[in-house]
Swiss-Prot record:
Keyword Membrane assigned: yes
InterPro entries hit by this protein: SH
Annotated protein name in UniProt: Small hydrophobic protein
Intravirion side: 30-57
Main location: virion
GO biological process entries: symbiont-mediated suppression of host NF-kappaB cascade
Membrane topology according to the record: Single-pass membrane protein
Function text: Plays a role in the inhibition of the host NF-kappa-B pathway. This inhibition occurs at the receptor level, by preventing the signaling of TNFR1 as well as IL-1R and TLR3.
Tagged with keyword Transmembrane: yes
Residues on Virion surface side: 1-8
Amino acid sequence: MPAIQPPLYPTFLLLILLSLIITLYAWIISTITYKTAMRHAALYQRSFFRWSFDHSL
């Protein structure tokens, strides 16, 4: 057995942990962005509807 070879199991475990953390981070960010985007979209839609209604009269 070569002594230079790094232990595979801890590296594999670290890789899995890292990917899990990255996935969780991305999911949280996308959820927050989606919620704020939906809120802003509702706000803009409401104001735009009011503006078009005022200008149509």
